[in-house]
């Protein structure tokens, strides 16, 4: 299996992301204000908690955008809010010709959107379809929807922008792991889950053009729809640690890749790194033992399933079946392959669990 994973940040680059975020926090939270627990409710004149507004300003600065909004519903809620701000029910949405992420498909169906599909790996085909069918907006997933995807996000967005097609990027699994996210590459808005970035449960973010963000804010009238100040502060507290933690994790994956392909575990046929959806190792065995390896691995401390996909709760390594979109693209692979995400563990822990699990079969 040949894959085209996204380029991870180096440790030095990740540190610079962290430092820039902290610098922005200092600009918006003078004195001891960052040490508070956050406020609640609809502050007069803001119609949201004051601390939440400041956190949103920090996020906008961090991602070089005009504005940002925190929303309920994690990554799915962010995508829903973004699409609703860009499109009216029944309009046409351009997507990559690949399996659509299941929760995103639900949003598409709820809005009654008509899908226009094209292979984003082929820029000439993309340009032709955009010119001929004139979609009302485009949804571009930053990470890979199928193993063979190789498109460069900035190139896809440049093609859409040249044609005047508004674009929303699903930046889940990419934020603070790569140099730039969608709104920094030409998308109108980026959407992502803060839960995946060591933040609080159920909080998502939309970052990008002010006019789109203002349309989202207009829907957040009631107090119950707000992200409260305490939740917003949790977003920043988690986000600060995300770039370096994920860079360390990427280094562990790279070393595991070399070890596994170098024969460290004889039962392993091959290993590749893929964004499926998180950046993980896809480990293929010579024999169809995937299900049994997963069963044994959890007895030895491996996580058997994700919580929020790299959330603050996921510390041991994850040994899990291939993602739904990858299985849909390669139905036979699930019997001989698994995905491994080191999370906060080192390569020796992953190798020990893998070897012991295979030996027990």
From Swiss-Prot:
Pfam families: Aminotran_1_2 (PF00155), YhfS-like_C (PF22475). Disulfide bonds: none annotated. One of its GO terms (molecular function) is pyridoxal phosphate binding. Gene3D superfamilies: 3.90.1150.130, Type I PLP-dependent aspartate aminotransferase-like (Major domain). GO terms for biological process: L-homocysteine biosynthetic process. It comes from the Bacteria. InterPro entries: Aminotransferase_I/II_large, OAc-hSer/O-AcSer_sulfhydrylase, PyrdxlP-dep_Trfase, PyrdxlP-dep_Trfase_major, YhfS-like_C. This is Uncharacterized protein YhfS.
């Amino acid at each position: 299996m040949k894959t085209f994973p996204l380029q991870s940040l180096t440790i030095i680059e990740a540190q610079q992301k962290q430092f820039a975020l902290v610098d922005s926090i200092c600009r918006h939270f003078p004195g001891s204000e960052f040490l508070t627990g956050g406020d609640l409710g609809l502050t007069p004149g803001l119609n949201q908690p004051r601390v939440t507004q400041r956190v949103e300003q920090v996020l906008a600065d961090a991602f070089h955008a005009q504005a940002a909004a925190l929303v309920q519903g994690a990554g799915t809620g962010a995508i829903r809010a973004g699409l609703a701000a860009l499109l009216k029910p029944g309009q046409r949405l351009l997507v990559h010709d690949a399996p659509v992420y299941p929760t995103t498909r639900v949003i598409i169906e709820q809005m009654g959107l008509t899908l226009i599909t094209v292979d984003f790996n082929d820029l000439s085909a993309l340009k032709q379809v955009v010119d001929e069918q004139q979609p009302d907006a485009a949804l571009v997933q930053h990470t890979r929807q199928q193993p063979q995807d190789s498109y460069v996000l900035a190139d896809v967005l440049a093609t859409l922008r040249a044609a005047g097609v508004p674009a929303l990027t699903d930046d889940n699994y990419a934020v603070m792991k790569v140099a730039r996210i969608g709104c920094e590459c030409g998308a109108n808005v980026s959407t992502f889950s803060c839960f995946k970035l060591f933040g609080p449960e159920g909080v998502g973010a939309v970052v990008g053009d002010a006019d789109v963000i203002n349309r989202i804010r207009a829907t957040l009238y009631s107090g119950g729809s707000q992200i409260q100040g305490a939740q917003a502060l949790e977003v920043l507290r988690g986000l600060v640690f995300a770039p370096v933690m994920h860079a360390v994790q990427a280094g562990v994956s790279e070393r595991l890749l070399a070890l596994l392909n170098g024969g460290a575990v004889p039962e392993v046929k091959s290993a590749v790194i893929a964004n499926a959806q998180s950046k993980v190792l896809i480990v293929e065995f010579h024999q169809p033992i995937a299900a049994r390896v997963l069963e044994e691995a959890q007895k030895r401390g491996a996580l058997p399933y994700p919580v929020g996909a790299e959330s603050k709760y996921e510390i041991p390594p994850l040994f899990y079946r291939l993602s739904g979109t990858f299985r849909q693209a390669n139905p036979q692979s699930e019997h001989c392959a698994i995905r491994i995400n080191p999370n906060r563990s080192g390569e020796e822990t992953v190798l020990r669990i893998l070897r012991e699990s295979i030996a027990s079969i």
